[in-house]
Amino acid sequence: MQIVVLFDILKRILMEEEKKSLNFIEQIIEDDLANGLKREQIRFRFPPEPNGYLHVGHTKAICINFGLGEKYNAPVNLRFDDTNPEKEEQEFVDSIMKDVEWLGFKWDKVLYASDYFQQLYDWAVQLIKEGKAYVDEQPSEVITEQRKNPTEPGIESPFRNRPVEESLDLFERMKNGEFEEGSMSLRAKIDMVSPNMNMRDPVMYRILKRPHHRTGTTWKIYPMYDWAHGESDYIEQISHSLCSLEFENHRPLYNWYLDQVYEEGRVKNKQREFARMNVSYMITSKRKLQRLIAENVVNGWDDPRMPTISGMRRKGYTPASIRNFIDKVGVAKRENLIEIQLLDFCVREDLNKVAKRVMAVVDPIKLVIENYPEGQEEWLETENNPEQENAGTRQIPFSRELYIEREDFKEEAGNKFFRLKLGGEVRLKSAYIIKGERVEKDENGEITTIYATYDEKSKSGSGTEESLRKVKGTIHWVSAKHAIPVEVRNYEKLFTVEQPDAEKDVDFLNFINPESISTIQGFGEPGLKDVAVGEPLQFQRIGYFTKDQDSTDTNYVFNRTVTLKDSYKPE
């Protein structure tokens, strides 16, 4: 009996702990399940508008919706809210699909709001017949003026109570293209004194004589976002419509529209909002991102300094690192500023696990091993990734003349300098122990060549007594004879302040970092020729890099993803 009681207590404790670990959206879903929603009725969607490239802010919505789909084994639709033909293009549809797939998620169906244009139109006609919508012939500026403000009641349109037959006739003629853009609109008849401005007879349709990327010139009128969005959710039977906090005030309108078409027995979708993700030193306004491109601050949507998913991918961020970042940020109800250092931390943490280790010298100086036979070369074995047991090894060439980093040598240095100096020893990574002997300088006194000797019995991994000898420093190198030239692009923050668009009266372009990119020429081991574009790499002792799409057979370009180390630790 005692065992049963203890088991029940333990079970309750575990259930309470599980409940505490749920975020507020998961708790809403669990409550809905407890109140009769069937598990097989759970369905989500990610509904981007195809008018630009996805950015870091979208990754949160993607991860939340698809993550919930995985948690509840529920389908997630990728639905394009393509209701504005002025700004939407197939190029953006393709890039969005690529980004979602790259992040590691799979949708159930690809759908479009334009799939539902006829149904939305039919429902709008139904609302007109019921006296809940009317055609307004006033310009948009007048409509805006009549809405007033939250503390002042709005003014009703003189067309608000026109006969239903008139509105039906005009709406059909709007659809047929008989009227000019801006001359008429269809408005819902709700409440012109509501403190919620969205409820003051919102526009449902406007005239737009622009070709649509999917429907061509079939339609001359297009539904507004608020009308199309919730009804699309209803058509697809989305159980939980999740969006950012900016749409919280739109929820009453979302529900009002839904109430007009809802049929008993169907799933009644509910909108819930979560905090948007703002990351320091980044902007996500599409208009401002377009300005960066138009004014040649950056080189396109996939510039590695851009906060777009395509830019982050090109810079070398991994899908796992972004998903982990979103997981650490969590799902909150209040907006706050996320430190970019947390994103870098997640990227660095993942790259440490998966990046292949390679050798490259980004500020080269020649090193000649005087007692190594001229013309001789050998191939040495070195590990690909000590963090992965099955990563294996590779062969790298070694010869008499090498390149090392300029900062890895000093003619004279104290006891705390554990790199190469005259009279001092250092190990060449995966190779031999060498000793600095002398230098050669140009007419300006700059060192051009370092001369050293090597201990031929000290080869790494050979098992000799000399190879086991301990020296305090190990440096990387590349064989001068075999090295390939590499162009290294080091990226810094695009802006000099945490919130570049925080001040409304100051142009955000004033905060552009003039040193957001620097390009240097170096040398890399020959295997870098065959590295795939986008493959994560660690340039040993330097940082994490990836091969860029600008690479050619004669010019190998590598983007720095993040530095090797940082003092930042998440709280």
Residue ranges and their predicted role:
Residues Q2-L14:
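Short, Lys/Arg-enriched N-terminal segments with co-localized hydrophobic residues
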Residues K20-E30, A34-M97, H213-S244:
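N-terminal catalytic cores of NTP/NDP-binding nucleotidyl/phosphoryl-transfer enzymes
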Residues N35-R39, G67-P75, D99-K109, Y234-I235, ...:
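Secondary-structure transition/capping motifs at alpha-helix termini
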Residues P47-P50, R79-K87, K109-Q118, E141, ...:
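Conserved short loop/turn motifs at secondary-structure junctions
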Residues D82-N84, Q90, Y112, Q126-L289, ...:
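Active-site cores that bind ATP or allylic diphosphates and position pyrophosphate for catalysis
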Residues F92-F117, A124, G131-Y134:
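A glycine-rich helix N-cap at a beta->alpha junction
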Residues V267-C346:
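Long, charged, mostly alpha-helical binding arms that flank functional sites
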Residues F325-K333, L337-E571:
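Substrate/cofactor-recognition hotspot
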